[in-house]
């Protein structure tokens, strides 16, 4: 059972500008809660929050809490895992005896308030929850949405809908998703990651089992071997076979810019649809979203038109612009499996001659920023294998995400291993983002697809190129 959230109780977010925190703040302010927050950065998100009525201060000091207390407010104070116990705001809030909620406590409370779909899994959570939200919006359901990315049809990561359903992204990185009790839990896949939190794959599997145990119903991807072995859902979906599964979306034609597929329920064909997204992984994400909507009783006929409107969230194969004849694409891929799938999709655009760009790209220049020293060390061989699938490769320095450096773990180490596996691949390692930008300028060619991947600040490449 989640912690009770009283109507119109004031709430203060430490780090309100984060993608997960800002989504919650938008929901609460729309529902009448006095909402405030702090974030040291001045960003478009903080400006948007202020326009919605959230009080935002751009510092994190004890004075922020003192001001709230002097105004007679004793807010619930919300923190994420990223906020250290040494944070001065958090220390003062504890000293004042204020209620301290983890972000997951607040999300759990909102999930409990209405029929909810919680989307979990190692990869594809944001895309699948975005596609689920889009299908429900296009079907006239107007769901509440709390997503870890910008949903194109909403222009936001948080939406306080007026329909009966809530769609939430359930992040497994810190294990807090076990607090959620949704009506439907959707699990996209499972693979070892977040080794800074989990002791190993078994630990991660046990956490996902606990999440599944807390759901009224579970929908899972049968194409994932780990889920197939360790999870017992109420329903399966697949994109490889319609046999033995409750839902399937089988590809009839895969192109560099779209996919024609046939949807099945209990082995029987229901209808064909055109998915305006390339890649088998995107078809799987869409199949999971379709299956979830069907389990919530939405007729396929009301969903099929929405399929043509599907767009991925921000930073998921996101065309930022064209620079001197090069297509600059930003993607959040930061795990070897994500990198492998994203590069395969990009190569399909090059080889098939079909792409979402004005003309098909002729070469693939991959740019990768490793995320966390611990992840780079754990998956060095897998990254080296995945990153070979390009015509030229540029590596940015490891984005630490607050971690201390590890001896011998750096982008040059990764480059050396890739070169051993593929000696003829052109590779360069940048010293910083400015150097990376210069390398893109000098090593790319007209009609190149420049694909920047990573969960850090590598998305700063496009502003530097276009400046």
Swiss-Prot record:
GO biological process: cell division; cell wall organization; peptidoglycan biosynthetic process; regulation of cell shape
Enzyme type, top EC level: ligase
Catalytic activity as recorded in UniProt: UDP-N-acetyl-alpha-D-muramate + L-alanine + ATP = UDP-N-acetyl-alpha-D-muramoyl-L-alanine + ADP + phosphate + H(+)
Protein name, as recorded: UDP-N-acetylmuramate--L-alanine ligase
Pfam families, A to Z: Mur_ligase, Mur_ligase_C, Mur_ligase_M
Function: Cell wall formation.
Entry keyword set: ATP-binding, Cell cycle, Cell division, Cell shape, Cell wall biogenesis/degradation, Cytoplasm, Ligase, Nucleotide-binding, Peptidoglycan synthesis
Taxonomic superkingdom: Bacteria
Protein's cellular compartments: Cytoplasm
GO cellular component, as recorded: cytoplasm
EC code(s) of this entry: 6.3.2.8
Record: residues binding ATP: 121-127
């Amino acid at each position: 059972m989640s912690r009770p959230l009283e109507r119109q109780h004031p709430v203060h977010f430490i780090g309100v500008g984060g993608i997960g925190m800002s989504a919650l703040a938008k929901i609460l302010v729309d529902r009448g809660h006095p909402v405030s927050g702090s974030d040291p950065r001045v960003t478009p998100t903080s400006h948007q929050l202020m326009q919605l009525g959230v009080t935002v201060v751009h510092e994190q000091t004890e004075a922020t809490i003192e001001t709230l207390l002097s105004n007679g407010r004793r807010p619930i104070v919300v923190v994420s895992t990223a906020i250290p116990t040494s944070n001065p705001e958090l220390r003062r809030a504890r000293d004042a005896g204020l209620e301290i909620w983890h972000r997951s406590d607040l999300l759990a409370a909102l999930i409990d308030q209405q029929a909810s779909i919680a989307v979990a899994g190692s990869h594809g959570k944001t895309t699948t929850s975005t596609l689920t939200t889009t299908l429900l919006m296009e079907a006239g359901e107007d769901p509440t949405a709390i997503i870890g990315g910008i949903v194109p049809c909403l222009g936001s990561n948080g939406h306080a809908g007026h329909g009966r359903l809530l769609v939430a992204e359930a992040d497994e990185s810190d294990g807090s998703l076990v607090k959620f009790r949704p009506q439907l839990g959707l699990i996209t896949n499972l693979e070892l990651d977040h080794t800074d939190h989990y002791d190993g794959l078994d630990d991660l599997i046990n956490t996902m089992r606990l999440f599944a145990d807390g759901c009224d119903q579970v929908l899972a991807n049968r194409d994932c071997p780990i889920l197939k072995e360790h999870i017992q859902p109420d329903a399966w979906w697949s994109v490889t076979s319609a046999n033995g599964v409750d839902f399937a979306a089988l590809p009839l034609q895969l192109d560099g810019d779209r996919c024609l597929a046939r949807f099945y329920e209990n082995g029987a064909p229901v209808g064909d649809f055109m998915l305006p997204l390339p890649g088998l992984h995107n078809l799987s994400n869409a199949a999971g979203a379709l299956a979830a909507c069907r389990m919530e009783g939405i007729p396929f006929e009301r969903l099929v038109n929405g399929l043509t409107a599907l767009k991925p969230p921000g930073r998921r194969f996101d065309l930022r612009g064209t620079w001197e004849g090069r297509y600059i694409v930003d993607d959040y891929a930061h795990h070897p499996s994500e990198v492998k799938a994203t590069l395969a999709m990009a190569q399909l655009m090059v080889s098939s001659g079909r792409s979402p760009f004005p003309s098909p790209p002729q070469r693939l220049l991959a740019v990768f920023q490793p995320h966390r020293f611990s992840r780079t060390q754990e998956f060095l061989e897998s990254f080296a294998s995945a990153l070979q699938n390009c015509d030229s490769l540029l590596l940015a320095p490891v984005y630490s995400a607050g971690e201390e450096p590890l001896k011998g773990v750096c982008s040059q180490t990764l480059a050396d291993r890739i070169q051993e596996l593929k000696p003829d691949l052109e590779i360069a390692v940048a010293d910083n983002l400015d150097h990376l930008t210069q390398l893109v300028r000098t090593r790319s060619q007209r009609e190149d697809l420049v694909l920047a991947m990573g969960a850090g600040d590598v998305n700063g490449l496009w502003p530097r190129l276009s400046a």
